[in-house]
């Protein structure tokens, strides 16, 4: 495995070294906020220009979804971030807890994908004997219940005193949302047949979106 980005204190700033496997909007955004870990257990946030250099090397990533987003991997080799470009330094453990909470709050995008797929699945029903109808009904009932759970999870995590139990419940809920989106988009593809694989058809796009959300803001609990 390639080493994550490390931050080493140097005169006038911090030196960043290591590998970032995922950076979006390269070639689009002017500045990027990069996080690196120091030996003292800190997370150091610094701003770097969105251009390649001898110390920052991008590698394009061919992706099945969001290919127009300019997503690359970045390798840092002695990239010095001046003190005036450092936007924050915080303890790693505190940052991890905050990041996990943020990543676990609310799954409206995932559930939106499921909702759209279910609506299209219902529209694809040929007659009253088509299994797409009962499948859409069952998925729709599950979606309604999941939306209610989403509200409850959001309420629990919004409490500053929320515990690891609440975070665990949120991770489990997120997994349920992802599974629902995948089952809904797969059912839609099965119902519409081979035409659903055409790039102009929403079925394949929704299936790819559901796949993307599996890795977006992924946490260890989520894996």
Model features per residue range: what roles?
Residues 68-71, 102-113, 138:
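Short, contiguous, pocket-lining structural segments
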Residues 77-104, 118-132, 151-155:
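A glycine-rich, basic-preceded beta-loop-alpha segment at the flavin cofactor/substrate interface
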Residues 106-110, 135-146, 173-177, 206:
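Amphipathic alpha-helix face/heptad-repeat signature
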């Amino acid at each position: 495995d390639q080493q994550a980005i490390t931050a080493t204190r140097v005169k006038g700033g911090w030196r960043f070294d290591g590998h970032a496997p995922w950076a979006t909007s390269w070639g689009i955004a002017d500045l990027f906020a990069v996080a690196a870990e120091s030996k003292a257990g800190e997370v150091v946030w610094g701003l770097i220009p969105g251009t390649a250099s001898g110390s920052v090397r991008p590698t394009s990533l061919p992706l099945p979804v969001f290919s127009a987003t300019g997503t690359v991997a970045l390798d840092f080799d002695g990239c010095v971030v001046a003190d005036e470009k450092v936007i924050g330094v915080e303890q790693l453990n505190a940052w991890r807890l905050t990041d996990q909470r943020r990543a676990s709050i609310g799954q409206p995008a995932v559930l939106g994908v499921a909702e759209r797929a279910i609506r299209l699945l219902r529209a694809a029903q040929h007659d009253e004997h088509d299994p797409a109808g009962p499948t859409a009904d069952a998925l729709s009932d599950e979606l309604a219940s999941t939306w209610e759970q989403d509200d409850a999870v959001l309420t629990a995590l919004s409490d500053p005193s929320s515990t690891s139990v609440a975070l665990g419940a949120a991770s489990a809920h997120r997994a349920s949302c992802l599974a629902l989106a995948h089952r809904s988009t797969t059912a839609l593809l099965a119902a519409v047949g081979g035409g659903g694989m055409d790039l102009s058809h929403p079925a394949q796009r929704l299936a790819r979106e559901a796949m993307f959300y599996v890795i977006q803001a992924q946490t260890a609990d989520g894996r």
